[in-house]
């Protein structure tokens, strides 16, 4: 991996190292997950979090089609996801897409906000990047402003 992710975390959030996660949590995604951060919850509860993923595109894949189709990937990957909205996100990332949705995990309603974009480099070609913020739905209003500001500050550096 030649890139690293930088983001100005909101108060109460911190980066999470892979070795802090439960064993097997990233099984099958170890090569794509580039950054994880979470808010430290006040009580034992689902912690609001950010996961940044990088997925290389094949030489025959159309970057524009992959970007638009990546919204379908989250729906297919998580049982019961309902997409609420998807729109261009030029104000956050050139050529980016912003989407949101909801699902239930272990009896907790969750809401996600995902920023997706394509980044091309000479050495590695085109890659799909996604930054997915997730929190309990009942807390989304309280966290949205922080999530939005973190997404604005997020950058991939070589």
Q: Could you describe each region identified by the protein language model?
A:
Residues 7, 101-103, 133:
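Preference for bulky hydrophobic residues occupying beta-strand positions
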Residues 3, 18-128:
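Conserved polar/disulfide-associated segments of primarily extracytoplasmic proteins
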Residues 11-13, 129-158:
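Surface-exposed amphipathic alpha-helical segments
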Residues 1-8:
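Short aromatic-glycine motifs in intrinsically disordered, low-complexity regions
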């Amino acid at each position: 991996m030649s890139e690293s992710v930088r983001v100005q975390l909101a108060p109460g959030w911190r980066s999470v190292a892979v070795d802090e996660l439960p064993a097997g949590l990233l099984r099958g995604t170890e090569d794509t997950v580039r950054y994880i951060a979470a808010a430290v919850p006040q009580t034992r509860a689902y912690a609001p979090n950010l996961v940044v993923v990088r997925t290389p595109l094949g030489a025959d894949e159309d970057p524009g089609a992959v970007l638009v189709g990546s919204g379908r990937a989250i729906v297919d990957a998580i049982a019961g996801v309902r997409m609420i909205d998807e729109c261009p996100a030029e104000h956050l990332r050139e050529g980016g897409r912003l989407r949101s949705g909801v699902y239930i995990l272990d009896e907790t309603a969750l809401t996600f906000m995902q920023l997706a974009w394509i980044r091309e480099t000479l050495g590695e070609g085109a890659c799909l990047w996604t930054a997915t913020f997730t929190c309990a739905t009942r807390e989304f209003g309280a966290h949205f402003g922080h999530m939005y500001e973190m997404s604005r500050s997020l950058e991939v550096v070589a």
